[in-house]
Amino acid sequence: MIFLIFSILFLHLANCDYTPDWESLDNRPLPSWYDDSKFGIFCHWGLYSVPAFRSEWMWWYWKGTQPDKDVVNFVDKNYKPGTTYADFAKDFTAEYFNANQFAETVKTSGARYFVFTSKHHEGFTMWPSRTSWNWNSMDIGPKRDIVGELRDAFKKTDVHFGLYFSQFEWFHPMFLDDGKFNTTFYPEQVSYPQMIDIVTKYNPEVVWSDGEWDKSDDYWKAKEFLAWLYNSSPVKDQVVVNDRWGTGTMGKHGGFMTYSDHYDPGKLLEKKWENCMTLDKHSWGNRRDMKASEVNTAYEIIEQLARTIACNGNLLLNVGPNMHGQIPAIFEDRLEEIGRFVNITSEAIFGTRPWIHQNDTSASNVWYTSKYSSGKKPLKNLYQNVYNFQLEEHTIVYAWILDTSHEQFELKSVKTTKNTTATILGTDVVLTGFEESDSMIILSSKIDWKKLPRRDIIVLKIEKAASYLRNPLMSTNEHHVQ
């Protein structure tokens, strides 16, 4: 079986557009749907949701090279002597799991894509993997194809479906032996066939690799996999991937960059990137002792979304369901609150590009996004796909004012003309009467605060601001366009 898989792959690679080397693979254009989508929901769910203690790394903290005393004590106190991690599987019932409800919750959040953990570092697969016998959601625990049910549910929506996949497994005997004997049995017989399996069975539009850092991209056969994915897979035209494909690849190779978890550069990056973060500030997986104060507020997430998309990133926000298959109510409440505002301000988010400024040069906590009114690029240059120029007749600027406590807001990055207007999204309020000026001033007294969808965030749609050129990637110099 393994020989057949590799034979098919090498036959495909013989006549293909992309070859298994980074020079070729890194030249593949990123499908536009991903950049346009801006906001996604991540979901970490696996066997670790049964003990639900510390984080999804619980097994490693319990039985790894340096056991955590608190985790060891937790198991000793709450489980019978001799308990193993595999014993948790019988309690992983998922009896309340409803894939359609998951899809509806994601849809309510306003997110445009969804990424689910098909397998985390524990090795338990959430689909019936042939290379993970009796250690998958069909053979034990829920006895359901969780990935398949989610794929079918998201097919009914316009939300893109993606899969996270951990390359390594902490305690898999083959992986441990490979480290001892410099062999490659684990990728050849386990992880590589699993990647092919999830793509061919479930057609994910995102393949989100992780757990790669301990071995090289050659060990994981990452380049061979990506060449097949881009050339011959059933999702070759629309799939996107991240940058975690082996030691030293993060931030260098792949589709979009992640650089690290919770990455927030605060400046424009030329390469498309993603900020993956959690609603629970301390864990990706479900945590039984999580406190309400440890959950990010809707404001904090919206603020992070604005900062991220202003700098050419996407935001991937994680939730962790419990062992019964329920997304915690506090997470659902947060997603609903976020979704209300995202849907009201959607034109300032989806399909936008960074502007010539990412945040304001003077006003505190103001971030910018932009788009062209015609939907077409009126000027072309090397960075036309990274940011939009400021052209009075073409550019719409969205100013995300994230600190509304001032009596006036002076936006020094926006130069006004007599034709400039500013609409407060979510209201029918249009501010006019601007003069030719090197900054835009909005008086708090001119705002009908009762009409705002939120009083702690204002999003302005600015049209016909004065033209001027600035390359935010190369210099701070600017000049007016006549």
UniProtKB/Swiss-Prot annotation:
The keyword Mitochondrion does not apply. Residues 1-16 form the signal peptide. Its EC number is 3.2.1.51. GO terms for biological process: fucose metabolic process; glycoside catabolic process. GO terms for cellular component: lysosome. The record marks 276 as: May be important for catalysis. It comes from the Eukaryota. Pfam families: Alpha_L_fucos. It catalyses: an alpha-L-fucoside + H2O = L-fucose + an alcohol. Glycans are attached at residues 182, 343, 359, 419. Belongs to the glycosyl hydrolase 29 family. Alpha-L-fucosidase is responsible for hydrolyzing the alpha-1,6-linked fucose joined to the reducing-end N-acetylglucosamine of the carbohydrate moieties of glycoproteins. This is Putative alpha-L-fucosidase. It comes from Caenorhabditis elegans.
